[in-house]
A protein has these predicted regions:
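NAD(P)H dinucleotide-binding glycine-rich loop of Rossmann-like/cofactor-binding domains
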Residues: 50, 89-153
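Short glycine-centered segments of the SAM/dcSAM-binding site in methyltransferase folds
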Residues: 87, 146, 170, 236-237, ...
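Mid-domain Rossmann-like dinucleotide-binding core that forms the NAD(H)/NADP(H) cofactor-binding site
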Residues: 124-198
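Glycine-rich phosphate-binding loop and adjacent beta-alpha segment
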Residues: 175, 223-294, 328
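Short amphipathic alpha-helix with an adjacent loop that forms part of the alpha/beta core around
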Residues: 199-210
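C-terminal hydrophobic helical "lid"/dimerization subdomain
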Residues: 276-328
Length: 328
């Protein structure tokens, strides 16, 4: 059955930001075990760019966006433990969050606690849960570790750096400008390198007394991948979790052996939150870190939903810091 009218961003062909359209249509009522959420804030992420350009293929026409926060406006049959009017947030494996209303599976939403705003929650679900699994599950960062974080002033980067510092690690961040370097220093980085100015490998080797870092978190991809491998200590780990500059080059496993028997992984958030229990655990620890002041959510940009294309242009042009949020 059809319900209220809702505006949403859709696209009918892969391409640049210009393919995004704002449309209005009736939103179906929630099916069994679904809730309908009226969004108050929507997170913008690089995965949205991958969906739009076709790097991650999807059926067309398609919506866009994986994370949002808002208010429950309707419950489908069989929903338990949730009420109309409650504040919730979610991250979803299929796009469609760039909208005023959305129906989502009840088991995939989490309640937003007091002390966390809707905009913070929308900016945290994908980026914050990504930081959670990177730091607590892919490699369990602990006191004494030295880590290297690319895009340290970005949405995931700022959360990673703050949380890693709170865990006792020494953080070396890489950013694209002096302005971003200042932001990174204020959010957990002990040392900050500027890409294009500082030689990555020699700088890291100097800072670590030629030992190398325990783990590299690299969301940039092609432009930084090989140099990142040369920054890692013996038996260390390379975590390639994004392709902002393009996919990393293919390498032989022997390249890892030659550099000290390194570990290489390309993790995805959605493999870490398959079960309701995994999602709930990650959200609980993430919100606790925010409420305790260990992680401050930096929302650098806000746009109305109608300007989603501008948000993408700024994100791809590396003109953003922290998280970007759309407001319906």
């Amino acid at each position: 059955m059809l319900g209220a009218m809702s505006q949403a961003i859709r696209f009918y062909a892969h391409g640049g930001p210009e393919v995004l359209r704002l449309e209005e249509a009736q939103q179906a009522k929630p099916a069994a075990h679904e809730v309908q959420v009226r969004h108050t804030a929507i997170g913008v992420n690089y995965i949205d760019v991958y969906d739009r350009t076709g790097l991650y293929p999807c059926n067309l026409p398609s919506g866009l966006g994986r994370e949002a926060a808002g208010i429950i406006t309707a419950l489908g049959r069989g929903v338990r433990g949730l009420k109309v009017g409650e504040r919730v947030a979610y991250v979803y494996s299929t796009p469609g969050a760039y909208s005023e209303l959305r129906n989502v599976a009840a088991e995939r939403v989490v309640k937003v606690p007091r002390g966390v705003s809707d905009e913070q929650a929308a900016a945290l679900m994908l980026k914050g849960l990504t930081a959670h699994f990177l730091l607590r599950r892919t490699y369990r960062v602990a006191r004494g570790d030295t880590i290297l974080v690319h895009a340290a002033a970005g949405g995931v980067g700022l959360i990673l750096c703050q949380w890693a510092k709170a865990l006792g690690a020494k953080v070396i961040g890489v950013v694209g400008s002096e302005a971003k370097a200042d932001i990174a220093r204020k959010h957990g980085c002990k040392h900050v390198l500027i890409s294009g100015r500082d030689a990555l490998v020699s700088s890291v080797r100097t800072l670590t007394k030629d030992v190398g870092v325990t783990v590299v978190y690299d969301a940039v991809g092609k432009d930084t991948f090989m140099d990142s491998l040369d920054c890692i200590r013996r038996l260390g780990m390379m975590v390639s979790y994004g392709n902002a500059s393009g996919p990393p080059p293919a390498i032989s496993p022997l390249e890892l052996t030659k550099r000290g028997s390194l570990y290489l992984t390309r993790p995805s958030l959605f493999n870490y939150i398959v079960s309701r229990e995994e999602l709930a655990l990650g959200a609980r620890e993430l919100f606790a870190a925010v409420r305790a002041g260990k992680v401050k959510v930096v929302i650098g940009q806000k746009y109305p939903l109608s300007r989603a294309a501008d948000a993408h242009r700024d994100l791809e042009g590396r003109r953003t810091t922290g998280s970007t949020v759309l407001v319906p």
